[in-house]
Amino acid sequence: MSSAFDFEPMPRRASVAVDVGGVIVGGAAPVVVQSMTNTDTADIDATVAQVAALHKAGSELVRITVDRDESAAAVPKIRERLLRLGMDVPLVGDFHYIGHKLLADHPACAEALAKYRINPGNVGFKDKKDKQFAEIIEMAIRYDKPVRIGVNWGSLDQELLTRLMDENQAAGSPLTAQQVTRETIVQSALLSAELAEELGLPRNRIILSAKVSGVQDLIAVYAMLAARSDHALHLGLTEAGMGTKGIVASSASLGILMQQGIGDTIRISLTPEPGGDRTREVQVAQELLQVMGFRQFIPVVAACPGCGRTTSTVFQELAQKIQEDIRTSMPVWREKYPGVEALKVAVMGCIVNGPGESKHADIGISLPGTGETPAAPVFIDGQKAMTLRGPKIAEEFQLLVADYIEKRFGHGQAAAE
């Protein structure tokens, strides 16, 4: 039965597929998760360690800064070290100002990178702009590499902005400065892509991005870009900020765009706290795609938020422990238990929603709330399987989860089939 309130994501916008070192971006491929290092690329040990950590966390592409000769010289060594570690992760070179020179002077770097990222706003200035842009495109053609043309409103092409502002001022019904800025961002990306194609770079070697730091601006700019091209699109909110603010801003903007079918690869740009874990941005990107139903990366642990009926912290501690165990175990589980990403575990704190939510999970437990009988029913595949009692309920449930995973996704399943 259909309803006026039935709601599903819009079909993915049709885009040209781009092969980035064996990872397909666009076309019918799933939305790709990527990240960026914050190490000095010339520090090979630190960069290899961070790329490895990001890739292990689930980043399918990793971008590194290539800003000087020492960084460019380090790239092939970084690539070689990663391959020795068994990590064939595509590396994206982030170029600004002198990318044309670095690629020409360091052919091993140009070969080792899986993609070049260039910014039309600072690839060159005045009469040098088109020449230096062309030199990078020629290198991409020579080495058969894709290019992301990444416009950023913090380094916008000032000549184009000035021209559009002047044209707008002369118009009968001028747009606001914000609207002209948005149009400039879109035109900068599209004109650069057009020039790249004129220079001979195939359409299936071009990805576009148009990053701003305001949620509404980002949604507007990408909607405009999506309507006016079929290039694969890289989504990201630049300067999103730290902590909760950065997560909320990125999730709100990227979530809306992906719900509209826009976006082929995403990066969650979080400002890490001093000494913070860089892999957090990968985790947030995966969780965003998973909660929206676009991809499955890790088993889901559903847990109630707690209320006056759940003064005990047992259910919170158990939910946290299971979540941590899952995240820690996933690198092994992906190989050992194919399909385990689809697992849903429920850890509930009282009788109100506990049994119902647990029945909807693959395996769930409803712990006793305040004043309730000290017993915890366990539900497996929608049916009540047992009731746990005593001081070791949490430990016993963890063993049940491990046993369920082994039987459903391990060799036991294969033998049964």
UniProtKB/Swiss-Prot annotation:
* Pathway where this protein functions: Isoprenoid biosynthesis; isopentenyl diphosphate biosynthesis via DXP pathway; isopentenyl diphosphate from 1-deoxy-D-xylulose 5-phosphate: step 5/6
Query: Which positions bind [4Fe-4S] cluster?
Result: C304, C307, C350, E357
Q: Which reaction equations make up its catalytic activity?
A: (2E)-4-hydroxy-3-methylbut-2-enyl diphosphate + oxidized [flavodoxin] + H2O + 2 H(+) = 2-C-methyl-D-erythritol 2,4-cyclic diphosphate + reduced [flavodoxin]
Top-level class of the enzyme under EC nomenclature: oxidoreductase
Q: What is its EC number?
A: 1.17.7.3
Q: Which InterPro entries match?
A: Dihydropteroate_synth-like_sf (IPR011005), IspG_bac (IPR016425), IspG_bac-typ (IPR004588), NO2/SO3_Rdtase_4Fe4S_sf (IPR045854)
For this entry, list what GO says about its biological process. isopentenyl diphosphate biosynthetic process, methylerythritol 4-phosphate pathway; terpenoid biosynthetic process
Residues spanning the membrane: none
Query: One of this protein's Pfam families, by short name?
Result: GcpE
What is the superkingdom listed in this entry's lineage?
Bacteria
Q: Which cofactor does it need?
A: [4Fe-4S] cluster
- What does the Swiss-Prot or TrEMBL cofactor note state? Binds 1 [4Fe-4S] cluster.
Q: Which keywords annotate this record? A: 4Fe-4S, Iron, Iron-sulfur, Isoprene biosynthesis, Metal-binding, Oxidoreductase
GO MF terms held by the record: 4 iron, 4 sulfur cluster binding; 4-hydroxy-3-methylbut-2-en-1-yl diphosphate synthase activity (ferredoxin); 4-hydroxy-3-methylbut-2-enyl-diphosphate synthase activity (flavodoxin); iron ion binding
Family to which the UniProt record says this protein belongs:
Belongs to the IspG family.
Query: What job does the chain carry out?
Result: Converts 2C-methyl-D-erythritol 2,4-cyclodiphosphate (ME-2,4cPP) into 1-hydroxy-2-methyl-2-(E)-butenyl 4-diphosphate.
> What's the name of the protein?
4-hydroxy-3-methylbut-2-en-1-yl diphosphate synthase (flavodoxin)
